[in-house]
Each structure stands twice: as structure tokens, then as C-alpha cells.
Amino acid sequence: MLDSLSRRSFLSTTAAALGATALGAAPPVPPGKSRPVIVASANGLRTMDKMMELIRAGVDPLDAAIAGVAVVEADPLDRTVGYGGIPNEEGVVELDAAVMHGPTHSGGAVASIRNIMHPAAVARLVMKRTDHCLLVGEGALKFARMHGFPEVDLLTDDSRKIWLYWKETNSRDDDRFPPSADEMDPLVKEFFGPKYVREHGTIHCSVLDTHGDLGCTTTTSGLFYKIPGRVGDSPILGAGLYLDNEVGSAGSTGRGEANLLNLSSHTIVEAMRRGMAPKDAALEACKRVAATNRLPRLRDAKGRPNFGVNFYALSKDGK
């Protein structure tokens, strides 16, 4: 994505991505109330009306955000989140999610959870029904079962086909062979077409309600074909999302390891605390990611980042 971009272009391109994300705002509200605003990654656009309706009805901002991302978590056509997400290298879908609630400044998360379609809702229960902030793996699954979440096979047939083709073409030294060109499934052929990239797919959503309170969530199936147990930034408070009810909310998608190393979402909120506008705060995080990207394998021949990150920022005043 960034092979032909200078560092300055990297920053400006990321800023442009901020403007291309879903942004929802309701009509004017009565005096004494805040104007509700929703900021989300592009795959959250179709959930805006539902979330705004909930906010207008007085639903908590975090609950509205979770209801919105649940639509995407259940969509088998979104292969970066929830049901139908691309699996790890062993063909198993592992999900990560986190939530933060502005009025109580509390948060919860789950990581590497299997067989549960709605990890964001489980993360909310971690926040509300335990003294912990993060549950992982088998412990997260047992907790979800305890609270009545049904287990489902998250691997759809389409995602299985994509994973299998990747498995069959991943090495020349094993005994697997991919199908011939005329036998290849059209879906697989399209997926691995000229524009194919190994994605870090995610959905983030930040909500500001009419009372001026904030809530946010980030949920993902993670890096395609990841090492089992790999956890990116999405379920880590401060990295994949962060908020302060007196300042604003932020979230991230893209290369999770870069956001983990720089606590990007926390960086954005703290920049807004110092008076930066949301866009400038997000660019501040971009600059930090670029400046600290020192490993040769993550830089092109000119020393520029060879990966992408996207940031989503919403200030307390609705900007």
C-alpha cells in the first residue's frame, strides 16, 4: 500500500482515510442537549441509522455502539470481523474485541475467543460482571458460555475455501497442490486477484450521545492466517481503542503491532486533551508510528513504512 509513498504522503493519505470513514450526526437537538455523533470505520456505515435511532431513544452510547457492530459481526460477507472472518493458519477463527464506557471510565475485552459470534458483547460483560479488563482464550469462552452465549462454527465455507487456497500455496516444500486455474472457485480467484493484500481487518465505532457521554468498541477476527493465539491491538485498551469522557474517543485499524507499540488510541486522546483537533491528534499518532518504525522488514528501500494504519477520533464537543 505504501510502496510509492513518502513519509509525508503516508501521513496525508492516512488523514484522507479519516475523512473517508463513516460519520453520522443527528439533526439539531433541544437546548441543553449535545448533538449525537457516531464515528466508525467504513464497514460500520450501514449500521449508522440503527445506532442513531438507539441514541435518540436514550440508549447508553456503548450499548448503541455494540448493537451497531453486532450487525457486522454476524455478516458472513465481512471477512474481517466475527462470523465468516478469515481464520488463523490452522483454519480456526479467533476473535478479539474491546469496549470502553465513558461515564464510568471502565472497559473490558476478550482475545483469542473461539466459537462466539459477538465478542464485543462478551467484552461488555467482562467490564460489567467481573473485576477484570481482559479475558483470553479458553477462559473467555467459558465466561461467554456461562452468560448464555451460544457456540457456533465461525468458519463459513467461503472463508474455508480462501484459507485452504492460502494453505496450498503457502509453501513449495510441502505436499499440497492448489487447484488448476480452470478448477479454482470464482470466489477464491477474485479474493486472490491483483489487488489482494493480507489484511488486518477490523471495525471500530465511537459514539457521543445527547448527554455528552462517550462509548466505543473495536472488534475483529484479526490478521489473516495469523499464528494461533496472536493478539493484535483491537482488544488492548489504549492501543485498539481508548476514551476519556472529558476529552474524546479514539480507535484504530490496520497493522495491530504498530498500534500496540505506540499505544496509538491513547496517544490520540492525550493529544486531544492538550487541545489538538481530532484530525491533528490522529496525525500525531501517524507521525509517532512512522518515527518509531525502525525494523528493516517493515520499511521499503527508502526507509518508508510498508504497511497501513487508520485512526478514528471523536472529541467531546462532537468534532
Positions of PLM-derived features:
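Alpha/propeptide regions of enzymes that mature by internal proteolysis
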Residues: 2, 12-19, 27-319
